[in-house]
Amino acid sequence: MGEPAFTSFPSPPVLGKLKRNMMPWALQKKREIHMAKAHRRRAARSALPMRLTSCIFRRPVTRIRSHPDNQVRRRKGDEHLEKPQQLCAYRRLQALQPCSSQGEGSSPLHLESVLSILAPGTAGESLDRAGAERVRSPLEPTPGRFPAVAGGPTPGMGCQLPPPLSGQLVTPADIRRQARRVKKARERLAKALQADRLARQAEMLTCR
């Protein structure tokens, strides 16, 4: 008997490297857009973020690194910039100055009307008291006011603000009495806090 004959099958043809992309055009376009967005995000993360504060000039945030050459990165033009003034606050302060609509200084009558608005019933009394004190000797000190400086009249002498509501003087005995009251109040507060702390500790022990 002879040896069995081996049947040889033809090998498939070699196709070689494909030259055409098998992805659909729409999917390929979406992939390119996604890769471009990812590249832009990586580029944005590599740059220093900008500090957005109340300052009108943006400055990059300083990243802390462990090397001696760490410096605040900024533009060269920022070196000569002056600190911006708060114009709104400056205008508010200017509006508080006692002056008339023409820009002139306000008279005692204008100030009297302002004081009557702020504290009704006290402006007239203060001005009457100022007029009565003007009759006295200029060297005689009056309670609640500083004596006039020698060499000329004090500006705004007739525009005295109303005195405080309590006209009595504070004596050292009043100060010592108030200090004793404060000390007693603090002692009562310390005792109350200690009792509360002990009660909380006892409650925690009973809950366990």
UniProtKB/Swiss-Prot annotation:
Domain of life: Eukaryota
Gene Ontology terms, MF aspect: methyl-CpG binding
Family membership: Belongs to the MBD3L family.
Keywords assigned: Repressor, Transcription, Transcription regulation
Coiled coil: none
InterPro entries on file: MBD2/MBD3_p55-bd, MeCpG-bd_2/3_C_dom
GO biological process, one term: negative regulation of transcription by RNA polymerase II
Pfam families, A to Z: MBD_C, MBDa
Membrane-spanning parts: none
Protein name: Methyl-CpG-binding domain protein 3-like 3
Gene: MBD3L3
Leftover remarks: The MBD3L proteins are encoded by strongly repeated regions of the 19p13 chromosome. The exact number of functional copies is unclear, and some of them may represent pseudogenes.
CC per GO annotation: nucleus
